[in-house]
From Swiss-Prot:
One of its GO terms (molecular function) is RNA polymerase II cis-regulatory region sequence-specific DNA binding. The keyword Zinc-finger does not apply. CDD domains: homeodomain. GO terms for biological process: cell differentiation; positive regulation of transcription by RNA polymerase II; regulation of transcription by RNA polymerase II. Belongs to the NK-3 homeobox family. At early tailbud stage, expressed in the pharyngeal endoderm, concentrated within the pharyngeal clefts. Also expressed in the mesenchymal head cells in the future infrarostral cartilage. Beginning at the mid-tailbud stage, expressed in the muscular layer of the midgut. The gene is zax. Based on similarity to Drosophila 'bagpipe/bap', the name 'zampogna' was chosen after an Italian musical instrument related to the Scottish bagpipe. The keyword Transport does not apply. It is found in: Nucleus. Keywords: Developmental protein, DNA-binding, Homeobox, Nucleus. This is Homeobox protein zampogna. Residues 77-87 have a biased composition (Polar residues). Pfam families: Homeodomain.
Length: 224
């Protein structure tokens, strides 16, 4: 069985007599192919508004229609903002937090020294004074304002800490009795006794008396 050509030339070359032989179908049924003609060497489908579909082409069209439907549904969902990538959920959740983080300004030693010196003289600055100080230090007015606020808070916290410190030192100390085991016959030595012990203690500590030797008197010998 040869395949029927669906080219435009073949459709236009068909005569009007073949139109009467077309059989229309109701619903989704496709009309059966007509009997082959004698003057044509191959089978042709009669001309119709919608040419019949082969099983392969019908399957391809059905798949393409399904893909188009999915693509339209995904596009509509993405436009409504409901479609989100699960892998990018954490990044989307963290993006507002990262945008809210502010970079901390780093001051040089000269700037900190000048700010400290000005703070020791004046803790509160007016608008013009703040602008002049910021211009001289090459800073913004916001940076100078925030630095003075933090410095005042730090000073206040130190003051509160110093005020609460004496109260803790006034707490009465408790005396705790400690038992010391000392024998009754044991003598307690003072530091002075340890440095210069008395002779009496050494005398009593000596166990034996010294021996006394009696020597005869020396008598000179006179020559006779």
């Amino acid at each position: 069985m040869s395949l029927t050509s669906f080219s435009i030339q073949d459709i236009l070359a068909r005569t009007g007599g073949n139109r009467g032989k077309d059989t229309r179908t109701d619903g989704n049924n496709i009309s059966p192919p007509p009997s082959p003609s004698a003057d044509e060497g191959h089978n042709e489908w009669p001309r119709a508004e919608n040419p019949p579909l082969t099983p392969e082409k019908e399957k391809t069209d059905t798949d393409s229609g399904t893909e188009d439907f999915h693509w339209e549904r995904d596009t509509e969902t993405a436009n409504n903002g409901a479609f989100t990538d699960p892998s990018s959920g954490d990044r989307l959740a963290d993006s507002p937090k990262s945008s809210k983080k502010r970079s901390r300004a780093a001051f040089s030693h000269a700037q900190v020294y000048e700010l400290e010196r000005r703070f020791s003289l004046q803790r509160y600055l007016s608008g013009p004074e703040r602008a002049d100080l910021a211009a001289s230090l090459k800073l913004t007015e916001t940076q100078v304002k925030i630095w003075f606020q933090n410095r005042r808070y730090k000073t206040k916290r130190k003051l509160i800490a110093t005020q609460t410190a004496p109260k803790s030192s006034l707490v009465p100390t408790r005396k705790v009795a400690v038992r010391v085991l000392v024998k009754d016959d044991q003598r307690q030595y003072c530091p002075e006794d340890m440095l210069s012990p008395s002779l009496l203690s050494l005398y009593h500590a000596y166990q034996y008396y010294p021996y006394m030797y009696c020597l005869p008197a020396w008598v000179p010998h006179l020559p006779l």
